[in-house]
Amino acid sequence: MIDLSSLFGELDIYLFDQLLRGRIAGGMTVFDAGCGHGRNLVFFLREAYPVYAIDPDPDAIRSVRSLAQRLAPLLPASNFRAEAIEACSFPDHSADVVVSSAVLHFARDEAHFRAMLEGTWRLVKPRGLFFCRLASSIGMEHRFASLGGRRFALPDGSERFLVDEPYLLAFTSELDGELLDPLKTTVVQDRRCMTTWVLRKGA
């Protein structure tokens, strides 16, 4: 029997959906912008995708380098760097697929959100895929306590920068991106909302 957890790791289910729909194919360069300890990278490393990743936490990058050494030993350690997204040293148009999973909602304010988003978007190749999952207020608009601006206290005890549909659609237009799927939001039992935002970059 196939060990699915060994094959896919803890791959985000909505990112898995992009794989199933053929939008992420073998040989595409994958960049995880805010990779943590690599939960979304196991499959791509195991299947020999060209993989790059950044995270501001040096411990997380050490973990990802160790994971890559085990699953894809031919990838250089320099593919994985301890850097903030808004100060990323990788060049523009680095990847066919750029993943931003549970990252942008850690923005301090709107200026920081914009810097993080623009730092991520520039990495996407023309006609490339941008996959983003982030906290939002969609579906629970009246359940969050404002901390000023777009920062809110959530019922689960966390504090997040929250987007909404008009905010994401405005950025979609500003970035000249093509919305590949309608915005999809999961409400987690009156605790928080997570929205999936998938764009195709223009030529």
Regions found by a protein language model. Give the residues of each.
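Flexible, active-site-proximal loop/turn residues at the rims of small-molecule/cofactor binding pockets
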Residues: 104, 116, 136
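Class I (Rossmann-like) S-adenosyl-L-methionine-dependent methyltransferase catalytic domain
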Residues: 1-25, 30-31, 36-87, 130-203
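Non-membrane alpha-helical structural segments and their capping/turn regions in soluble enzymes
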Residues: 58, 110-114
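A short acidic, Gly/Pro-enriched loop at the edge of an enzyme's catalytic core
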Residues: 86-98
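A short glycine-rich, Lys/Arg-flanked "PGG" loop and its adjoining helix->strand segment in the class I
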Residues: 114-126
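A short SAM/SAH-binding and catalytic strip from SAM-dependent methyltransferases
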Residues: 97-111
